[in-house]
């Protein structure tokens, strides 16, 4: 069985994340992950409800190292969480909040660094390519939310493909700030896996309001990469406030008009990219709406038509998917 390292190599254990202005090295992150992995209960599934992106990532990779599947709900609504807890065997909840999101399952709270207690070099776990690491859910806009399982190897391939495309647009790896939820496929891929598995740097914040986005960007060193939505982007441009220099901007979740993309590029001075993807497929194509009408698929992704359906195959996809 083929395996992959839990984290890609980083000469000298370079910076992997920023937490409220403080740089966190790859080695420190790895120590956090392995320390938490030792504390995790014996279980098959974890409901990762951390609100801080850094602690979410620590919990996510700790679970991977223990062979535990992260269950990532598409909504924090109590009824949705209750349904997941009732329907998922061998489940516990992980969060950085004082009160547990649910009293139906065991709860483990995290959020206090233990990396300073570690010494020496930590052994890097090797993860089976086909190990299931996450279960994500569709939005339910066309019916009941559907669960989709993801494996480590396929998500690594997807992160590599996104890194190739995005770092090309940005002219090099960046620190990634996201305004989007990281338990959804877009946010997980672009604000957690792209920086950690794709050679960038993760930012712990998830700002919503324009002033908060500008403040969070100002905490980060250049080059900066903003992962957002058309809604957040429009509000940011309308706010008419000073925005720190960006290397590139990425949008998804709703169609990005050419007018808005062009306005963003003119105002922010950075290439404005748009992603095509879904929970089922992950992201499979991009375009630059200001100058491109057609989508450009990721390396290895092939499309073909069967009657009135478009089928995607190859690349990081485990099987053929109808778009």
PLM region spans:
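Conserved pre-ATP/AMP-binding loop-to-beta segment of ANL
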Residues: 5-12, 114, 119-137, 169-175
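Conserved helix-loop-beta element of the AMP-binding
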Residues: 108-110, 155, 175-177, 224-227, ...
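Conserved AMP-binding/adenylation subdomain of ANL enzymes
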Residues: 157-175, 183-225
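Conserved AMP-binding/adenylate-forming
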Residues: 36-76, 174, 178-182
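Conserved AMP-binding/adenylate-forming core of the ANL superfamily
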Residues: 5, 10-40, 150-153
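Gly/Ser/Thr-rich phosphate-binding loop
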Residues: 237-293, 302-304
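AMP-binding/adenylate-forming core of the ANL superfamily
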Residues: 302-323
């Amino acid at each position: 069985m083929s395996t992959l390292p839990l984290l890609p190599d980083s000469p000298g254990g370079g910076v992997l994340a920023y937490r409220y202005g403080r740089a966190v090295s790859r080695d420190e992150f790895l120590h956090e992950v392995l320390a938490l992995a030792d504390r995790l209960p014996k279980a098959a599934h974890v409901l990762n409800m951390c609100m801080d992106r850094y602690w979410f990532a620590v919990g996510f990779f700790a679970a991977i190292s223990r062979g535990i599947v992260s269950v990532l709900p598409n909504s924090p609504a109590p009824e949705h969480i209750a349904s997941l807890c009732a329907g998922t065997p061998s489940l516990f909840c992980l969060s950085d909040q004082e009160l547990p999101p649910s009293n139906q399952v065991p709860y483990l709270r995290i959020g206090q660094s233990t990396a300073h207690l570690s010494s020496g070099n930590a052994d890097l776990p090797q993860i089976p390519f086909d190990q299931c690491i996450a279960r994500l859910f569709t939005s339910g806009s066309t019916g009941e939310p559907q669960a989709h399982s993801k494996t480590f190897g396929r998500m690594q391939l997807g992160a590599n493909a996104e890194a190739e495309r995005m770092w090309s647009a940005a002219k090099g790896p960046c620190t990634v700030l996201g305004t989007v939820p990281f338990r959804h496929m877009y946010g997980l891929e672009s604000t957690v896996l792209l920086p950690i598995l794709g050679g960038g740097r993760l930012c712990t914040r998830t700002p919503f309001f324009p002033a908060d986005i500008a403040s969070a960007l100002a905490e980060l060193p250049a080059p900066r990469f903003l992962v957002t939505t058309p809604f957040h982007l429009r509000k940011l441009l309308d706010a008419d406030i000073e925005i720190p220099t960006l290397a590139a901007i990425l949008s998804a979740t709703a169609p990005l008009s050419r007018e808005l993309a062009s306005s963003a590029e003119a105002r922010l001075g950075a290439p404005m990219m748009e992603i095509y993807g879904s929970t089922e497929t992950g992201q499979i194509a991009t375009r630059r709406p200001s100058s491109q009408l057609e989508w450009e698929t990721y390396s290895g992704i092939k499309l073909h038509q069967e009657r009135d359906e478009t089928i995607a195959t190859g690349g990081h996809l485990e099987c053929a998917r109808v778009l």
